Amino acid sequence: MRQTNVALLYEAQRERLALTHVSGQLDRTISVTEDRIWPADLIGHLNLIHPARLQILGAAELSWAQRQSREKIGHHLTEIINARPPAIIVADRCQPPPILCTICENADIALFTTPHPAASVIDQLRLYLSRELSEKISLHGVFMDVLGLGVFITGNSGAGKSELALELISRGHGLVADDIVEFSRIAPTVLEGRCPAMLKDFIEVRGLGILNIRTIFGETACRRKMRLRLVVHLERRLPGQTDPSRLPMHRETQEVLGVPVLRAILPVAAGRNIAVLLEAAVRSTILQLRGIDSTQEFIDRQQRMLEGEPGPD
């Protein structure tokens, strides 16, 4: 179960949202208990159908409440409080009604106020919870920023992943993480990779030991995070092993946390410049993401020439 708590949310967002703690305890848990629930579902405008959410009350909700009888408002607030929401936030520079302060105080539900608009508060907290409560996985490999694309380099031990990363860094690309990469699914089709705090800025290369990339190459050689767009697998061919297709009709993909990611296999052999090949794979992927497929262009040109049409000049 993925979870955080109100205290951590308050500390992380207190300055950004100018939150003021009015009453209640901060120890209540915010958690994702089912796979079908997204972290963004855990917060929203005042909602009696989903009372267990983190509830946001803006000017519109408070204006509606003022038009209702005290008994009706007391009944609805009791329904919400009985569902034990993590917290209630009053936005739009509004003052929380006395009845709300009393109920939250008695039930130990955290009550906050903020001068920011309710919609802005919801957007900011949804983004925060989506990252904090996202699905996560740690994978072995090297994560790089190559030409602005997040590239995850994989391969068996001794395949040359760290050496390749070092060469790419010397060519102006950036290191995100070496050895262990933490990937988070921050949106239905978006994977974000980061480096564990212990390994940040470091890379281990056989024969050289541990190197601090930020110290050696400067600030621009390291990245804090990147979106994963391509997996490059380094593979040493064994005698008799079948070579991959020289003209693949479809790009291979690899699933990470249920999200398909484009995958390229680069055979490793003496004399091959893997850094140049990886850069070419990245450039090809960028073109494909823009709808340009070089393989399909070649097939279409071949078909036109077979049909008697003139080729390009």
Swiss-Prot record:
SUPFAM superfamilies reported for this sequence: HprK N-terminal domain-like, PEP carboxykinase-like
Protein name: HPr kinase/phosphorylase
HAMAP family to which the protein is assigned, alphabetical: HPr_kinase
Cofactor(s) this protein cannot do without: Mg(2+)
Active site residues according to the UniProt entry: 140, 161, 179, 246
Species per Swiss-Prot/TrEMBL record: Aromatoleum aromaticum (strain DSM 19018 / LMG 30748 / EbN1)
Catalytic activity: [HPr protein]-L-serine + ATP = [HPr protein]-O-phospho-L-serine + ADP + H(+); [HPr protein]-O-phospho-L-serine + phosphate + H(+) = [HPr protein]-L-serine + diphosphate
Keyword Plastid belongs to the record: no
Miscellaneous comment text of the record: Both phosphorylation and phosphorolysis are carried out by the same active site and suggest a common mechanism for both reactions.
Entries under Pfam families matching the protein: Hpr_kinase_C (PF07475), Hpr_kinase_N (PF02603)
Binding locations of ATP: 155-162
A molecular function GO annotation: protein serine/threonine/tyrosine kinase activity
Region annotation (Important for the catalytic mechanism of dephosphorylation) ranges: 267-272
Domain statement: The Walker A ATP-binding motif also binds Pi and PPi.
Enzyme Commission number(s): 2.7.11.-, 2.7.4.-
InterPro entries, per the entry: HPr(Ser)_kin/Pase, Hpr_kin/Pase_C, Hpr_kin/Pase_Hpr_N, P-loop_NTPase, Ser_kin/Pase_Hpr-like_N_sf
Residues bound to Mg(2+): 162, 204
Keywords: ATP-binding, Kinase, Magnesium, Metal-binding, Multifunctional enzyme, Nucleotide-binding, Serine/threonine-protein kinase, Transferase
Subunit structure: Homohexamer.
Family to which the UniProt record says this protein belongs: Belongs to the HPrK/P family.
Gene name for this UniProt entry: hprK
Function (record text): Catalyzes the ATP- as well as the pyrophosphate-dependent phosphorylation of a specific serine residue in HPr, a phosphocarrier protein of the phosphoenolpyruvate-dependent sugar phosphotransferase system (PTS). HprK/P also catalyzes the pyrophosphate-producing, inorganic phosphate-dependent dephosphorylation (phosphorolysis) of seryl-phosphorylated HPr (P-Ser-HPr).
CDD domains: HprK_C
Region (Important for the catalytic mechanism of both phosphorylation and dephosphorylation): 203-212
